[in-house]
Amino acid sequence: MARIKGGIATHKRHKKVLALTKGHASARHSLFKRAHESMVHAMSYAFAHRRARKGDMRRLWITRINAAARAEGLTYGELMSGLKTAGIDINRKVLADMAVSDSVAFAAVAAKAAAAKAN
């Protein structure tokens, strides 16, 4: 009986790995063994960084809100505290978008937060 080496399956798997490493440098996109190592690392980084992106975005929103709040004479903490006291439940993503694209509405929200903080 002839030995079965899995030629078609192996070829497909190799093609898939080489396709995934298309933009990689040097042997990492042309030799299967190096390409597979490169792909495993790349996928690992992609997995971790998809989760890290959530924190990156939150930090960006907070930075934008803080900058807009300081333009209104409040700090980020004072603004958030005032919003909580006033019972205004707007998340950071919406607040940051408002600060960038609709500064008039953000100023109105900040004024309500300042009034609630003063009382």
Curated annotation (Swiss-Prot):
InterPro entries: Ribosomal_bL20, RIBOSOMAL_L20_CS, Ribosomal_protein_bL20_C. It comes from the Bacteria. Keywords: Ribonucleoprotein, Ribosomal protein, RNA-binding, rRNA-binding. One of its GO terms (molecular function) is rRNA binding. One of its GO terms (cellular component) is ribonucleoprotein complex. GO terms for biological process: ribosomal large subunit assembly; translation. The keyword rRNA-binding applies. SUPFAM superfamilies: Ribosomal protein L20. CDD domains: Ribosomal_L20. Binds directly to 23S ribosomal RNA and is necessary for the in vitro assembly process of the 50S ribosomal subunit. It is not involved in the protein synthesizing functions of that subunit. Belongs to the bacterial ribosomal protein bL20 family. This is Large ribosomal subunit protein bL20.
